[in-house]
C-alpha cells in the first residue's frame, strides 16, 4: 500500500467540500427573505484551507441551474488563524479556476461541466490562500463576514489514525463483487473519529451513500483490541444509476483508493446528524430540524481532516 499521486490541491479537497469551537445543537426555522449562510470549509496537513459559502435554502436539496444561480456567497471576508497569525482568504470564481476543479464541481453538484464553465452557467466561488497550510495537532479559527452576518468556528486536525491492514473479501453469492475491509487496533483511552471516502479506477473520491463517519462508541471503543470493519463504496449522490441491491460492493476488477480521515468530535457530529437527516428524506437547513454544527452565527461545518491513503489492487487470477 502506498499514497497515490495527488490531484491538484483545490480539486482534491472540493470533492469533500461540496458534497458537502463549541459544539451545539440548533433548531433551524426557515426565515423568509433572509437565508442563513452555510459554511463548507476544511483544512488538512500541508494543504491550504478551502471555504465555500452557500445560502441555506439549497444545502442538501435537489439542484438545477436555476435553483443554484445564487447558491454561492460572493464578496465575503474570510479569515483563518492558526494561533500565530491570521490570513485573509482570496475569493476565486469558476471562470478563473482550472479545468480539473471545474470538473470536480460539476461532478459534486450533479450538473454538466458546461453548466459550470459556460459564461451563462453556474458561477462557483471558493475562498482559499497560499499563505497558510494545515499541520497535525493544529487548531484553526475561521471568521466570516458576509451578507451583514458574522460567523466563526474552531476546528482541529487530529493525529492520523493508521490502519493495520486493508483488503477485500468476496461477495457470498458471486465472485464478481467484493467487500472492502479494514483492520484497526484501538489505542487505549483515546477517542477516535473517522470520515472516509473511496475512489474507484482513478475517478474522484466520494463518501459512502448513507453514512461516511465512524465513531468511538460504535467501532473504536475496544480498549486496545483489534477490530475488523467492512466499508461501503462511495457514490456521487446525484448518480441516478445506483443499484441499491449491491451498492456497498466493489467490482472484483476495481482498483480502489481509500481516503481514511481522522476528524475531531465536532466534525464527526456534524456529518453524523446531517447524514441522518438527509437519509430520512429531509433537508436539514430548509426544514425545522436538530443538527450539530460548530459554526457560530450560521450553519454547516469548519472541519479539519488528517487523511491516510490506501490502495487495493484487483485480485489476481
How should these model regions be labeled?
Residues 2-10:
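Bacterial N-terminal signal peptides that target proteins for export
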Residues 18-21:
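C-terminal motif of bacterial Sec signal peptides marking the signal peptidase cleavage site
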Residues 23-317:
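A sequence/structural signal for flexible, mid-protein segments enriched
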Amino acid at each position: 500500500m502506498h499514497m497515490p499521486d495527488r490531484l491538484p490541491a483545490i480539486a482534491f479537497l472540493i470533492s469533500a467540500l461540496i458534497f458537502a469551537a463549541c459544539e451545539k445543537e440548533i433548531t433551524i426555522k426557515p426565515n423568509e427573505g433572509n437565508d442563513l449562510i452555510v459554511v463548507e470549509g476544511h483544512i488538512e496537513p500541508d494543504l491550504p484551507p478551502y471555504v465555500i459559502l452557500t445560502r441555506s435554502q439549497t444545502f442538501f436539496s435537489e439542484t438545477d441551474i436555476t435553483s443554484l444561480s445564487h447558491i454561492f456567497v460572493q464578496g465575503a471576508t474570510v479569515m483563518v488563524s492558526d494561533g500565530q497569525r491570521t490570513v485573509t482568504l482570496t475569493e476565486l470564481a469558476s471562470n478563473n479556476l482550472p479545468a480539473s476543479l471545474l470538473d470536480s464541481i460539476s461532478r459534486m453538484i450533479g450538473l454538466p461541466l458546461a453548466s459550470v464553465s459556460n459564461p451563462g452557467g453556474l458561477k462557483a466561488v471558493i475562498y482559499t490562500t497560499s499563505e497558510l497550510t494545515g499541520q497535525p495537532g493544529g487548531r484553526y479559527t475561521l471568521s466570516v463576514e458576509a451578507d451583514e452576518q458574522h460567523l466563526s468556528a474552531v476546528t482541529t486536525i487530529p493525529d492520523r489514525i493508521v490502519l493495520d491492514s486493508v483488503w477485500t473479501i468476496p461477495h457470498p453469492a458471486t465472485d464478481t463483487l467484493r467487500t472492502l475491509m479494514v483492520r484497526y487496533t484501538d489505542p487505549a483511552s483515546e477517542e477516535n473519529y473517522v470520515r472516509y471516502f473511496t475512489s474507484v479506477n482513478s475517478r474522484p473520491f466520494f463518501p459512502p451513500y448513507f453514512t461516511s463517519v465512524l465513531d468511538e462508541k460504535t467501532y473504536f471503543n475496544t480498549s486496545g483490541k483489534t477490530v475488523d470493519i467492512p466499508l461501503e463504496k462511495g457514490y456521487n449522490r446525484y448518480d441516478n444509476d445506483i443499484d441499491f441491491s449491491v451498492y456497498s460492493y466493489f467490482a472484483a476488477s476495481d482498483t480502489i483508493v481509500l481516503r481514511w480521515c481522522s476528524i475531531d468530535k465536532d466534525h464527526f457530529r456534524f456529518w453524523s446528524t446531517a447524514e441522518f437527516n438527509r437519509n430520512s428524506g429531509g433537508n436539514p437547513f430548509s426544514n425545522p430540524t436538530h443538527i450539530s454544527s460548530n459554526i457560530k452565527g450560521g450553519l454547516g461545518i469548519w472541519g479539519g481532516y488528517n487523511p491516510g491513503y490506501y490502495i487495493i489492487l484487483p485480485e489476481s487470477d
